[in-house]
A protein has these predicted regions:
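Calcium-binding loop positions in Ca2+-binding modules
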Residues: 164
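Right-hand nucleic-acid polymerase module
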Residues: 1-161, 172-310
Length: 310
């Protein structure tokens, strides 16, 4: 990391400030990646006063807040409804996805992995037992094989209720990978031949003794976030209520983030100043268009020495 992050103290002169609100968000990841998200409408720009109606800044709509008298507090309080519960569940799902997204950007991941559980060795229908075995195994690998190991994994449940995990790992040290003789083509595995040898080799993690394992090398780090977040579903959130929905090693820190409210006429000059402060070029861009919000994602990467191919 090159010194401090200059964008933490710059660009405040571009616009007015609203606490918690932003239409540009800048994120600095541990692996030297900078991300700029540009929103078509401000995020979190909602004001709620003492009345039951609150204006929503970016649409001009009004949101009605239902109130009821609470005899225990002698105050008018928000009435929770079925709609509130559904919204809460959706928000929980989105928060989990957002957390996994940001941590999945924090490392230069080397392998996608899938680990299953053998019913003769583990009660594969017991969430706590399966996740405990997996988490302990990763921590043991850090102690014995790869002291700098980074991992991020999420559980997934088979239709029959059995659990397995999907994840990514990096800085694998002396961990052992055995060539399975197969390659990954899309979502399927095929025996390697002269015809398909250019596809990703499927390895097995030799140290995983609780079931079956696969590992394939990451070829596009910008697809890691999409790969790992797709396993976070409504069904998973319901079946793991009150439990952890993802696991990460302690050496994956929180990224550094800052939000700005920038007036439309200042976007170009803001972006120029911001990118100049990074000192690196853009490597990836995508746009996501929604009914009420559109977001442009831009990624910039510091130059770093490539790891030697093993």
């Amino acid at each position: 990391m090159k010194g401090c992050c200059p964008y933490l103290t710059m660009a405040t002169h571009y616009s007015h400030f609203m606490e918690g609100a932003y239409n540009i968000r800048v994120i600095r990841y541990e692996n030297g990646t900078f991300e700029i998200r540009q929103y078509s409408n401000p995020v979190n720009a909602i004001y709620e006063g003492e009345t039951s109606v609150a204006p929503i800044y970016h649409t001009g709509m009004k949101r009605k807040v239902n109130l009821e008298y609470n005899p225990f507090t002698d105050e008018m309080e928000k009435l929770r409804t079925v709609e509130d519960a559904e919204r809460s569940a959706k928000n929980s799902l989105n928060r989990t996805k957002q957390n996994i997204y940001k941590f999945s950007r924090q490392a230069d991941w080397e392998y996608f992995i899938t680990l299953t559980f053998d019913g003769s060795k583990v009660n594969r229908y017991d969430f706590d037992e399966c996740m405990g075995k997996a988490n302990n195994w990763f921590n043991n690998q850090k102690k014995r094989k790869a002291p700098d190991l980074k991992y991020l994994f999420v559980p997934e449940q088979h239709k029959d209720g059995a659990w397995h995990i999907h994840g990514v790992i990096a800085d694998v040290g002396e961990m052992s990978f055995a060539d399975s003789g197969r390659v990954a083509i899309g979502q399927k595995a095929y025996r390697r031949s002269d015809v398909n040898s250019e596809f990703a080799t499927i390895y097995n993690l030799s140290g995983w003794r609780f079931g079956f394992s696969t590992a394939t090398k990451v070829r596009d780090k910008y697809k890691v976030a999409s790969y790992i977040t797709k396993y976070i579903t409504k069904d998973l959130c319901e079946s793991t209520f009150g439990k952890k929905r993802y696991y990460r090693s302690r050496n994956i820190p929180e990224p550094i983030e800052k939000g700005f409210i920038v007036e439309p006429q200042d976007f170009d000059s803001f972006m120029t100043e911001m990118v100049d402060s990074f000192g690196c070029g853009m490597v990836y861009q995508k746009e996501v268009n929604g009914l009420y919000q559109s977001v442009t994602y831009r990624f910039y990467q510091e130059e770093r020495e490539e790891k030697e191919n093993e």
